[in-house]
Curated annotation (Swiss-Prot):
This is dTTP/UTP pyrophosphatase. Keywords: Cytoplasm, Hydrolase, Nucleotide metabolism. Its EC number is 3.6.1.9. It is found in: Cytoplasm. GO terms for biological process: nucleotide metabolic process. One of its GO terms (molecular function) is UTP diphosphatase activity. Pfam families: Maf.
Length: 199
């Protein structure tokens, strides 16, 4: 059985991967999620995903031998601005106000390190999300749920956040944080397939 490592502590990514019956270790990366404003959002997402996977691979050392490390990084992009995770209520309010009644883009970079064949694959997925028009009162009420604080763009598409999302164009799971179709396409290039239970 292949040793699989998810380089993330995101409950959403963990749940998405668990549904395929894969046994995997959870080893969150210690990478600071620093955005390079000179790079396009998809490049930032891919760079951060790669840094996360590489950091975990290095830290595991000998125990990473022949393992498969999966990492991801999600970025929200609107009107030329990358929105990260809000660190307080003021930032969350600013972000939610900014995406209210508009379409924004969600990019998730995905990286897979397959030590058994010494390969690193990096790719990204893109989806468009339409948020309803929210009053200041609605924004504050949503912030009080506590959902915005560990999410890029200050919302979750599941939970209470589903009540502010009008529609999604593209991969839904990309918005959750792990684009499953893209992930499996990358795994197939390495000779694995989630549909066949090959991990």
């Amino acid at each position: 059985m292949k040793k699989v490592v998810l380089a993330s502590s995101s409950p959403r990514r963990i749940e998405l991967l668990k549904q395929f019956g894969i046994k995997f270790d959870i080893v969150p990366s210690n990478v600071d999620e620093i955005i390079d404003p000179d790079l396009p959002p998809e490049k930032n997402a891919m760079n951060l995903a790669k840094k996360k996977a590489e950091e975990v691979f290095r830290r595991l050392g000998e125990s990473a031998k022949d393992s498969l490390i999966i990492s991801a990084d999600t970025i929200v992009f609107i009107e030329g601005t990358i929105l990260g995770k809000p660190s307080n209520e003021e930032e969350a309010f600013y972000m939610l106000k900014k995406i209210s009644a508009k379409r924004h883009t969600v990019f998730t970079g995905v990286c897979i390190i397959d030590d058994s064949c010494r390969q690193i694959l990096v790719d990204f997925e893109k989806s468009y999300v339409y948020i309803k028009q929210m009053s200041d009162e609605e924004i504050l009420r949503y912030i009080k749920t506590g959902e915005p604080f560990d999410k890029a763009g200050a919302y979750a598409i599941q939970g209470f956040g589903s009540l502010i999302v009008e529609k999604v164009e593209g991969c839904f799971y990309n918005v959750v944080g792990l684009p499953l179709y893209k992930l499996n396409t990358m795994l197939q290039k390495l000779g694995y397939d989630l549909m066949k239970g090959e991990l």
